[in-house]
């Protein structure tokens, strides 16, 4: 008679006390389990007891090609138990989370990891529940006796109580907030973000180390609260040699894969430097590359390398055109000429005088582009000239009707221009920005009405149908540091803004929407 199998919901202690189940029958197929993601594997490894071998630092550096300096900085800043907060920042897919979790794995003291993947959490309440559940023996939910705090002050109190119980046992707790920039997109995220950055001051627990991982720059989180500033570790983009080392790591046939990367990596690296995107594209290409081979463990000679290259060359061109398709929009000149499509138009766009920068589409809505141009004009032009620049007769085209300026007035204009250059971009209220925005968008609509667009191409290109929620676009531009917002003026009682872009970028944005920006810029 076979022994009973341990039920699924049996606790860990009862399962260890129960007799071991009988071995599975040879005829019964094994149950397939989903393969855990690399990040879950790293989390499990980081939560495991630290290794005691003397080569742990060397093993860590071997697991992180191209990140030796960053790994050493993380170990140096996190190794002592009472450590200041740490922020890892850099572009996407630059190895920030992997370097952190592997470094925590090799830390010597007894430590406990509390990890919050903010990209997978939809709200502050879900974040509170995730952190408190990892620190508590019983999960926090609305149905249990442990209720999730709704207020940030209640959350800080509950978090302090949970951490006190762990710290009192001599453990070091590492609180990791991954993808910190996601908090800004949450409801009331602007209030939660300063709270998370001030947890070191609010908790007052030396054995609790806070680590923030962000794809945004530290300037995006600057606040004047007087809290302790974290230590920063910057992760730059990978070089082509570093990407090659990462892709070659633990490959079963390094010589064959090296010959493949020498053909396919550099063309793809010119388009993207993200390791995850490159890995996703290179995997099917490598299968195509190996199709002429009968044995995948064979080492190709020079003649075989040439034959493999000729076989994969056409597939590599398809991968460049399909996988990394750069979004573009037909210019108004092409609409006037009747439009053009196909490979010929793509070649003309990429072979321009200014290169890619003059033809690539900006990753923002059309209304945001017009709002950015309005802010640039409001910062550059004096407010007293708005009526003359944005009149119904076409702006500065009516200079012929002006009487000749005297020597004194010309000298005064020169003085005003010099003062403007010394002061830099000026500030402006919201009312003036909206007035200029309304004027230049109406000018754009008049230009579109004069062009006979076949097949309604203008509407497809996104030039018409401007978004009505201008305030939301304004907030996005401020968060992206295209605009700066100052405090409310004590006299006017409203906030003032300032444009942070230069004339070259403004002209590129204007060309992308076919707006005559130079016509509305004040020049001496």
From Swiss-Prot:
GO biological process: DNA replication initiation; response to sucrose
Gene Ontology cellular component list: nuclear origin of replication recognition complex
Location of this chain's protein in the cell: Nucleus
Gene3D superfamilies: 1.10.8.60, P-loop containing nucleotide triphosphate hydrolases
Distribution of this protein across tissues and organs: Expressed at low levels in the shoot apical meristem (SAM), leaves, ears and roots.
Keyword set, alphabetical order: ATP-binding, DNA replication, Nucleotide-binding, Nucleus
GO terms assigned for molecular function: ATP binding; DNA replication origin binding
Residue spans of biased composition, Low complexity class: 1-19, 39-49
Induction of expression: Reduced expression upon sucrose depletion-mediated cell proliferation arrest, and accumulates after sucrose treatment.
SUPFAM superfamilies per record: P-loop containing nucleoside triphosphate hydrolases (SSF52540)
Residue ranges, annotated region (Disordered): 1-56
Residues that bind ATP: 90-97
Pro residues bias: start-end ranges: 20-31
Subunit and partners: Component of the origin recognition complex (ORC) composed of at least ORC1, ORC2, ORC3, ORC4, ORC5 and ORC6. ORC is regulated in a cell-cycle and development dependent manner. It is sequentially assembled at the exit from anaphase of mitosis and disassembled as cells enter S phase.
Function statement: Component of the origin recognition complex (ORC) that binds origins of replication. DNA-binding is ATP-dependent. The specific DNA sequences that define origins of replication have not been identified yet. ORC is required to assemble the pre-replication complex necessary to initiate DNA replication.
Family (UniProt): Belongs to the ORC5 family.
Name listed for the protein in its UniProt record: Origin of replication complex subunit 1
Native source organism of the sequence: Oryza sativa subsp. japonica (Rice)
